[in-house]
Amino acid sequence: KAYPSGMLTDYARTLPSLWCARKSKIAGYDGTSMFENEKSEVTYPNIDVEACWDETGNNINVTTKVEPCMTPDAVNTYAIGYVLTASGLKNDKWLQQADYSAYTSDSYKDAPPEMDFFRNPSNYVDGNYYVKGYTFNHVAIESQGIRYGIANSLTGNFVPNEIKTHTTTFSNINQYNLIQDRNKLEVVAILFDTKNDRIENVAKCRI
């Protein structure tokens, strides 16, 4: 099974982890080549997602549309899962454990732009093992069906040019004090191939 017991159990019990996976696991310090290979894979269905606030401003209504661009194998079954993410999160009290202090040296002057934050010595504390002032993006706030997809979210056979629609709601968003800017919320819709235990396609949108 591709997702037998979750990230925290399998990889890191105490530290945040990132596992970027579709058919293959992408891990290690540099998964660029595997990531590019995953992007080049053709998917059977297209997926599109839209999200909007309801009249109370406290719930997010989500609509996902799935349309086959090729006819999937007859035995394949699919389901949709969702993640609500927040970006732009920052707190002076937050520290992130990082081992990137070597990037402050000229040896890494040609590092990609995303490493610029780690090139500044003033961002390090506690023996250069933690960084402060980091802005966290794409932080998961709430999920639905994140391991296998929501049961019965997509039913029946898939026919080319025939759109299947699924709707859901993220409720009581005001309960999440972690959210700092509602304009930086996104909904990610994940299309699971439940027959072969893999992620087939993904779409995301702003609310």
Describe the role of every protein-language-model region.
Residues K1-I207:
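Short, conserved sequence motifs used for protein processing/export or organelle targeting and
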